[in-house]
A protein has these predicted regions:
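TRNA-recognition modules of translation machinery and tRNA-sensing kinases, especially anticodon-binding
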Residues: 1-437
Length: 437
């Protein structure tokens, strides 16, 4: 049987791999001038990192998180099932998102901001969720994101959004085709009472709503705003709104965020029903949609002022966002653009006989040492076949070394497009190639 990749995963090959690399390069170019430095956390974390951070009642933890078993524990799973009792350090999961792991790393490595020095980091990593595979929704996907700890001021919320929109611009998006949604989810002071209002509203309309919304009424009532059932959405349009229940501090924080965005010329739409699927969010939340692209949200984030404490650290403000690579790429393509990075011009070095391979080998090493992408024949092809191979790999130049050229200390350089040929000194081959690329 032919080996196949797991369902809901993709191989990043060729143009897609170059696109992922380009997104990472753009991320560094946008985020580092703002003071953010790269971070990488393990793909495997203890389950409690996500249970405490994302929330036990969220769909991510309850339905989508991949559990990891190894060694003897895997044998027990086969015989006893997945509900086997394990020590906390043995209860492992693949990361479904980036924020909780970064915060865990900050707490564990004693990097929690002290005084006026914040912690700023960005990441570009694979995430894993056990969702039903479909367009823009994979079981292994990639995200670029930032985390900013120690910044309680609403200016930090606005700056994150400004960075996010600049990132989309650098990716090649026409920002007029994107829609930025913002809302406030309140905080630990005002949200519990609002949560109870929404819960009661759902219970009052339980006979008209889907099974999932009825279940959410007890576990996570705010998630009912995200229901895809059209009838449920019509009902939830009449539900109480967080904006009408914000405490004075949360309302002022939200108003200041909007003033900063207005001053920066950032266009946004207030969506009073916008909620994020993770429990750690507080106050400002935001999402970016690409209407017409057919992929839904292509990124989002918000404030999470209680997450560091949930992961065992001191109370610390935090804000961040993440952008999905696969969805962003699909949206770009839907708008007639792409993220494929241009490949460096290639040079092909051909030989006119097996006895010249050692000399060709030396030329290829010299060109590669100079940073020039170079291919050569190692399969004993004829000179005609080598020309065909040079065309196949997209070489801009082909260097042909024959016995006469070698005796004269020369090599023939041919432009594959114009077919112009010139003899150049072997001693100056790097400079000659660079001039023609």
């Amino acid at each position: 049987m032919q080996a196949q990749k797991a369902e809901g995963t993709r191989d990043l090959i060729g143009a897609e791999m170059r696109a992922w690399q380009k997104m990472q390069q753009i991320a560094a170019g946008v985020f580092e001038p703002f003071g953010f430095k790269p971070i990488e956390t393990p793909a495997i974390e203890q389950v409690d990192v996500f249970v405490h951070g994302i929330g036990q009642s969220t769909d991510v933890v309850r339905k989508e998180m991949f559990r990891v078993f190894s060694g003897a524990n895997l044998e027990r799973v086969f015989t006893e099932g997945t509900d086997i009792k394990l020590k906390p350090k043995q209860r492992l999961a693949l990361r479904p998102e980036g924020t909780a792991g970064v915060v865990r790393a900050v707490v564990e490595n004693n990097l929690v901001p002290q005084g006026s020095t914040p912690f700023k980091a960005y990441y570009a990593e694979a995430m894993f969720r056990g969702e039903r595979p479909q367009k823009g929704r994979l079981r292994q996907f990639h995200q670029v994101g930032i985390e900013w700890l120690g910044a309680p001021d609403p200016a930090a919320d606005a700056e994150c959004i400004i960075m996010l929109m600049e990132f989309y611009k650098r990716l090649g998006f026409d920002l007029s085709k994107l829609r930025l949604l913002i809302n406030s989810m309140g905080d630990a002071q005002c949200r519990p009472a609002y949560r109870e209002q929404v819960k009661q509203f759902i219970l009052d309309h339980a006979d008209e709503m889907c099974d999932e919304c009825r279940e959410r009424a007890e576990l996570n009532p705010l998630r009912a705003f995200d229901c895809k059932n059209d009838h449920c959405r019509e009902i939830m349009a009449e539900a109480p709104l967080m904006g009408d229940n914000l405490c004075d501090e949360c309302r002022e924080h939200y108003e200041q965020v909007k003033r900063y965005l207005d001053a920066a010329g950032i266009e946004y739409v207030e969506d009073p029903t916008l909620v994020r699927g993770l429990d750690y969010y507080t106050r400002t939340v935001f999402e970016v949609e690409a209407p017409g692209a057919g992929v839904g949200s292509i990124g989002g984030g918000g404030r999470y002022d209680g997450l560091v404490e949930l992961e065992g650290g001191k109370p610390t403000a935090g804000v961040g966002f993440a952008v999905g690579f696969e969805r962003a790429l699909l949206a770009l393509q839907a708008f007639g653009s792409d993220l494929g990075a241009d490949e460096a011009p290639c040079v092909y070095v051909a030989n006119a006989g097996k006895e010249l391979r050692q000399n060709v080998f030396a030329i290829t090493q010299e060109l590669r040492a100079a940073g020039i992408v170079t291919e050569a024949d190692y399969q004993g092809r004829s000179l005609k076949a080598q020309f065909k191979q040079a065309d196949k790999v997209g070489a801009k130049l082909i260097l042909v070394l024959g016995g006469d050229e070698l005796a004269a200390g020369k090599v023939k350089v041919r432009d594959m497009e114009s077919h112009d040929e010139v003899l150049v000194d072997l001693a100056n081959v790097v400079e000659a190639v660079r001039e023609r690329l």
